[in-house]
Amino acid sequence: MDTLDELLPREKMLRSGIASLSDVELLALFLRTGTPGKDVMTLAKEILQHFGSLYGLLSADFAQFRGVNGIGLAKFAQLKGIAELARRYYSVRMNEESALLSPEMTREFLQSQLTCEEREIFLVIFLDAQHRVLQHSRLFSGTLNHVEVHPREIVREAIKLNASAVILAHNHPSGCAEPSKADKLITERVIKCCQFMDIRVLDHLIIGRGEYVSFAERGWI
């Protein structure tokens, strides 16, 4: 009987489930074919080694891809499609679920939306009194290391949606999720502004590269 290591990714998935696949095998499953003189498993391994991680791979631009021998526009488009499908899946799920099921679901959604962004994006999730999702919006965009946030605009949008609570989030393209002094100050400003309209700020999450910081989990909110 074949061992799992000897099975092709597709057969291994059918036998043991998608979670049994390594990063290399999962990438090979999506790529489907290799290049002349190179099978798909070898190609997948070389691609991951070149970019260092799945994050590095899925956030790379076409110019970076052209540095990998045998990779063209078709496979670049496939991989960008994977990242976009994941982002849209979580976006649709957030819109269709009747409520936020768990902090994990919220974090997964925010990571899918913000992890690969090359500049800072400030996103707000608006919730009703039962903490059902009303809307999520990218309200502000900035530079590589800064985003200008206007608390009154957050409150204005919350009032328009009749929201009772909000969850704040933004990314750090540098990869480090630790909040800066400016991050803490803007959180305090948003909280104070929301309090005037009886709107609760439930959390502020900072999304880094494979890591996150939750103000609520740290007891700051």
Curated annotation (Swiss-Prot):
One of its GO terms (biological process) is proteolysis. CDD domains: MPN_DUF2466. One of its GO terms (molecular function) is metal ion binding. Disulfide bonds: none annotated. PROSITE patterns: MPN, UPF0758. It holds the Pfam family UPF0758_N. A motif (JAMM motif) lies at residues 170-183. Keywords: Hydrolase, Metal-binding, Metalloprotease, Protease, Zinc. Residues 99-221 form the MPN domain. Gene3D superfamilies: Cytidine Deaminase, domain 2 (3.40.140.10). Zn(2+) binds at H170, H172, D183. It comes from the Bacteria. Belongs to the UPF0758 family. YicR subfamily. PANTHER family: DNA REPAIR PROTEIN RADC, UPF0758 PROTEIN YEES-RELATED. This is UPF0758 protein YicR. It comes from Salmonella newport (strain SL254).
